[in-house]
Amino acid sequence: MTTAVGASQQLDEVGDRRGTGTEFANEIFAVVDVLNRESGLRRAVSDTGSETKARQGLIDAVFTSKVSPDCKELLDATTTCKWRSPAALTRALERQGVRAVLRGARQADRFEAVADELFHVSRLVRGQAALQVALGDPNRSVADRQELLMKLVGGQVSEETLVLARRAVVASDSTFEQVIDGYLHVAAEMADRRRAIVTTAKALTDAQRAEMVKQLERITGSPIELSEVVDPTVLGGALINLGDEVIDSTVAHRLDQARRELG
């Protein structure tokens, strides 16, 4: 049985051999929604204390007539994995939906464009506090929040970006922006690189951008995809977000440190 560490990679390999595009992704997302609604079913299919055959039989009974052969094969693969929790299973399947969308974008030669669009949608939401609240409001239906988002970006971005942006609204345990950031990290993994978000008081010159990429690649040992944010409040220097790592050399940060030291 595959360990938890290897489970995600195993599903990646199965997903990469099977369906691609938004239709396949939406099918996976629909399965995830069913599992999240039916907590007993989710526990049963992720219970590594049960025999693989029993879990396989449950998946057969619930999903065989409702999903495509490609999606069924992906679900079958989950029964050979060891899950730390029921939520780990649904997160892994959610990841496969995201990867399916991005694989479709790559086949259509829109991979980079979709990643850029996702980044800009995230920045759009981050820049509007009222929009952040509205998209995360549990008292509004998912459909209502998705409609609000579509009014802002519909017709301006690709089909792949629309599908992922709409899906990001569904999450109940993370903010919209956090979910989009997760999608961007998946995209960076698929491109065999890491994504760094750099915030500066004014736009970087070509020379500054090249030097920053060079230094980050030296530090991380990985190719870097740089996304830029201009924020005059940082005053000077740069704030770099690299996954869970933060490098803050901004003037605003140094001034704040000085104020704290002075009491």
Curated annotation (Swiss-Prot):
It is found in: Cell membrane. PANTHER family: ATP SYNTHASE DELTA CHAIN (PTHR11910). This is ATP synthase subunit delta. Coiled coil: none annotated. Belongs to the ATPase delta chain family. GO terms for cellular component: plasma membrane; proton-transporting ATP synthase complex. It comes from the Bacteria. GO terms for molecular function: proton-transporting ATP synthase activity, rotational mechanism. F-type ATPases have 2 components, F(1) - the catalytic core - and F(0) - the membrane proton channel. F(1) has five subunits: alpha(3), beta(3), gamma(1), delta(1), epsilon(1). F(0) has three main subunits: a(1), b(2) and c(10-14). The alpha and beta chains form an alternating ring which encloses part of the gamma chain. F(1) is attached to F(0) by a central stalk formed by the gamma and epsilon chains, while a peripheral stalk is formed by the delta and b chains. It is a peripheral membrane protein. F(1)F(0) ATP synthase produces ATP from ADP in the presence of a proton or sodium gradient. F-type ATPases consist of two structural domains, F(1) containing the extramembraneous catalytic core and F(0) containing the membrane proton channel, linked together by a central stalk and a peripheral stalk. During catalysis, ATP synthesis in the catalytic domain of F(1) is coupled via a rotary mechanism of the central stalk subunits to proton translocation. Keywords: ATP synthesis, Cell membrane, CF(1), Hydrogen ion transport, Ion transport, Membrane, Transport.
